[in-house]
Curated annotation (Swiss-Prot):
The gene is nuoD. This is NADH-quinone oxidoreductase subunit D. Its main location: membrane. Its EC number is 7.1.1.-. Keywords: Cell membrane, Membrane, NAD, Quinone, Translocase, Transport. The lineage of its organism: Bacteria, Bacillati, Actinomycetota, Actinomycetes, Mycobacteriales. It comes from the Bacteria. GO terms for cellular component: plasma membrane. It comes from Mycobacterium ulcerans (strain Agy99). One of its GO terms (molecular function) is quinone binding. It is found in: Cell membrane. The keyword Translocase applies. It is an enzyme of class 7 (translocase). It catalyses: a quinone + NADH + 5 H(+)(in) = a quinol + NAD(+) + 4 H(+)(out).
Length: 432
C-alpha cells in the first residue's frame, strides 16, 4: 500500500460486538433463530433475528433489504410526471398515498398548490380514504390469520375486494394505478361512479360490523393482544413512531387535523385514540378509523361538484378532460382531434410536453400525508430541470420497525408475532 492509496474498511459496528458476545456465551442457554425472510407471519420479506432463551425473546433485530427496488434512484432518471408510476409501487397496500404525497411535493415546487381544482381535491380525498379502509382490512385480516383467527381473514379480504373492484372501475387498475397526477388526476370519474361508490360504502358496512363482532370482545383475541407489544408515548417519541401505534398511547396526532392538505380541514371526522399502548388498542383504532373513513367518503360524495380535473395551465398539464382510447395510450379520436385540430404549434407543444416533461423551479420541499401506517413524508429536491435531483420518502413502515425490539424483548416468541402484526409493516415501503 502506498501513501496515496486509501483503504476503506466496512464493519458491522455494534453488530460485531453482538457476534463476539455470542461466541463467548454458553451455547446451551441461548439460541439464535431466523424468523423470515420467508415466513407467513412477517408481512412480506422481513427477516427477524431473534435471540431466545426457552420461549423468551432476549434480543430482536430486523433484517431488511430483501425487496429493494431502487425506486428513489429511478426517479432521478424519469420526468416529473413519470415518477408517479414508480412511487405508487412502494407501499403497495396504500398506493394512493404514495402518489398524493409525490404530487403535493411537485405542486408545491411549482407554486400551484392553491390552483388545484376543488373537484380534484375531493377525488383525491375520496380515493385516499377508500384506500385507507382497504389497507386496514389487510392489516386486520393478516393479523387475525397470524394469530389463528381465520374467519376474520376471509371477512377482511372479501370486503377489500369491494374496494379494489371500485378502484378498477375508476382507474382501470386494482392497485398501483398512477391515477393521481401533478396538477390533478389522470381522468375524471365516469358519470355513474358516484352512485357505484355510494353502493360500495353501503356494502362495506356489514363486513365491518362482522369483523368487530368476531374480535372486539373475543376472549382469546383479547388475551393475545391486550398488554402485548407495549410501547408508551415516550418510546414513540424517542423512535419517531407515528400512525396507529402513536395514537394507541392516547396522543391524537393525525396530519389530516394538525397539518391539513387536500382540503381535509373541510371534513368532519374524529381522530381515534386508545390508552392501552398495546396491540389491542392499535386493532381498535384501525377498526374505528375505517368507520371514520366511511364518513369522509360520504362527505366527499356530497361535495362532488362538476369541474375540471386538471389545472388550466397547459404548459404544465396534459389534457385530462379527454377520453382514453381503447388501447390505453390516450389516443382516442377526441384526443387527436383536440390536439391536432387547433394549430401545428399546439401539436408541437404537446409533443414536447410529453417527450421532454415539465420544468420544475429549483428548490426543495418536504410534504407529508397521513397514511394508514403513519406519517408518509417526501423530501423533494429540484435543480430546475425536467427530472428530480433527489426524492426521498420517509416511509412509516421503515420508521415503525424500529419498535420491534422495544415491543418484543422480554416477551414470548408468540407475542412477537402480535407485535409485528400491530405495526403492520409493508416491505415495499421499507425497501425502496
Amino acid at each position: 500500500m502506498t501513501d496515496t492509496e486509501t483503504v476503506l474498511v466496512a464493519g458491522g459496528q455494534d453488530w460485531n460486538e453482538i457476534v463476539e458476545a455470542a461466541r463467548g456465551a454458553d451455547p446451551g442457554e441461548r439460541i439464535v433463530v431466523n424468523m423470515g425472510p420467508q415466513h407467513p407471519s412477517t408481512h412480506g420479506v422481513l427477516r427477524l433475528i431473534l435471540e431466545i432463551e426457552g420461549e423468551t425473546v432476549t434480543e430482536a433485530r430486523c433484517g431488511i433489504g430483501y425487496l429493494h427496488t431502487g425506486i428513489e434512484k429511478n426517479l432521478e432518471y424519469r420526468y416529473w410526471t413519470q415518477g408517479v408510476t414508480f412511487v405508487t409501487r412502494m407501499d403497495y397496500l396504500s398506493p394512493f398515498f404514495n402518489e398524493t404525497a409525490y404530487c403535493l411535493g411537485v405542486e408545491k415546487l411549482l407554486g400551484i398548490t392553491d390552483e388545484i381544482p376543488e373537484r380534484v381535491n375531493v377525488i383525491r380525498v375520496m380515493m385516499m380514504e377508500l384506500n385507507r379502509i382497504s389497507s386496514h382490512l389487510v392489516a386486520l385480516a393478516a393479523g387475525g390469520m397470524e394469530l389463528g383467527a381465520m374467519t376474520p381473514m376471509f371477512v377482511g379480504f372479501r370486503a377489500r375486494e369491494i374496494i379494489l373492484s371500485l378502484f378498477e372501475s375508476i382507474t382501470g387498475l386494482r392497485m398501483n394505478s398512477a391515477y393521481i397526477r401533478p396538477g390533478g388526476v389522470a381522468q375524471d370519474l365516469p358519470p355513474d361512479r358516484p352512485t357505484e361508490i355510494a353502493k360500495a360504502i353501503a356494502d362495506l358496512r356489514q363486513p365491518l360490523r362482522e369483523m368487530g363482532d368476531l374480535l372486539n370482545e373475543n376472549a382469546i383475541w383479547k388475551a393475545r393482544t391486550q398488554d402485548v407489544g407495549y410501547l408508551d408515548l415516550a418510546g414513540c417519541m424517542a423512535l419517531g413512531i407515528t400512525g396507529p401505534i402513536l395514537r394507541s398511547t392516547g396522543l391524537p396526532h393525525d396530519l389530516r387535523k394538525s397539518e391539513p392538505y387536500c382540503g381535509y380541514e373541510n371534513y368532519e371526522f374524529d381522530v381515534i385514540t386508545a390508552d392501552g399502548c398495546d396491540a389491542y388498542g392499535r386493532y381498535m383504532i384501525r377498526v374505528k378509523e375505517m368507520w371514520e373513513s366511511i364518513k369522509i367518503v360520504e362527505q366527499c360524495l356530497d361535495r362532488l361538484r362538476p369541474g375540471p380535473t386538471m389545472i388550466e395551465d397547459r404548459k404544465l398539464a396534459w389534457p385530462a378532460d379527454l377520453k382514453v382510447g381503447p388501447d390505453g395510450m390516450g389516443n382516442s379520436p377526441e384526443h387527436i382531434a383536440k390536439i391536432m385540430g387547433s394549430s401545428m404549434e399546439a401539436l408541437i407543444h404537446h409533443f414536447k410536453l410529453v417527450t421532454e416533461g415539465i420544468r420544475v423551479p429549483a428548490g426543495q420541499v418536504y410534504v407529508a400525508v397521513e397514511s394508514p401506517r403513519g406519517e408518509l413524508g417526501v423530501h423533494m429536491v429540484s435543480d430546475g430541470g425536467t427530472r428530480p435531483y433527489r426524492v426521498h420518502y420517509r416511509d412509516p413502515s421503515f420508521t415503525n420497525l424500529q419498535a420491534v425490539a422495544a415491543m418484543s424483548e422480554g416477551g414470548m416468541v408468540a407475542d412477537l408475532i402480535t407485535a409485528v402484526a400491530s405495526i403492520d409493516p409493508v416491505m415495499g415501503g421499507v425497501d425502496r
